[in-house]
Every structure is written in structure tokens, then in C-alpha cells.
Amino acid sequence: MVKLVCFLKRKEGLTLDEFYEHWLGRHAPLIRSTPELARHVRRYEQHKRVTEPAWCGTEGYDGITIQWFDSVDEFVAFTAEPKYSELIEPDEARFLDRDAFVWMITEEPIVAMDGPT
């Protein structure tokens, strides 16, 4: 299992509320409702940024998405689907600053702590 972790920044001109409305209300359902895409994704998480206090996050980023795939090859297959370039890329352009995208594919976590010691 691998995870795609992306730091997201909203497109210039969008309010934070508009960004979240599109990301949570339109983008996620688009992936979920497209079988050619959904079959590749094991889990799709959306994390809103905590804004108070101001020092609680990476300044300028509005959220993080974490998408789980069985393998790197499965992630590559997801992005190679024709529906990805037909639906997802144009939708991302509606609400994301794609130039500010920061992403990484990670392996299964090494758990350093799991609850109080």
C-alpha cells in the first residue's frame, strides 16, 4: 500500500469557503462516481487546514489530500486513465493552484507511537 500526500492551495480569486465547497462537494464526488477512477483508489481523505492559531500549519496551503493505492503502479494507472485527463485535470484547474502543488508518494507508515505510553 502506498499513499499520495498532496498539499493543496486554492486558486487565486477563490475564498476559502469556495475552495472547500468545490473540493469537498464536487471534486471528491467526481472521483467517487467515476468507476474507471474509483477502482484504483483504496481510500481518499480530505483534511482541511486548522487556521487558528495561525502557526498551526504550512502557511499558504489550505488542505491536504491523502489517497491510498495498492502500489505505485496502481497510482500510475489511475493517472493514465482517460477519465483522469478528461474530468479530473480540468476540475483541478477550477479550484487549485496547480503551480503550488506539493506532493509525495509514501510507503506504509512506521508507527513510532500508538496512544499514550
Where are these regions (language model features)?
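Macromolecular interaction modules
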Residues: 1-117
